[in-house]
Amino acid sequence: MPRHKDVVFLGSSLKDLNEFPLDARRAAGFQLDLLQQGEQPFDCKPMKTIGRGVSEIRITEESGAFRVFYVINRPEAVYVLHALRKTTQKTEGRDIELARAR
């Protein structure tokens, strides 16, 4: 049985995630739990614009669209770089830059 990885939230990512509506928080938590167990989230994609090894979890709820950027290619933990509510079709430049910096 694979080791259960820790989740490490960088910067304000935990605070940002906790500001999601309850259903979106639950969905994000479930997807992060899958990552901890070495499984693939249901709806994710690589974010090469942010950096090598960075992916995003995509969550769509009645209240809107939400994203969680993370890095899983480290053996010790899943690193959550940024969590945000999408307000436009494209990911905003400031969100990409913030995730890159972390």
Task: Give residue spans per PLM region.
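Basic, Lys/Arg-enriched alpha-helical interface segments
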Residues: 1-65, 74-77, 85-102
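Portal/gating segments that form or line small-molecule/metal binding sites
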Residues: 68
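Short hydrophobic/aromatic beta-strand micro-patches
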Residues: 71
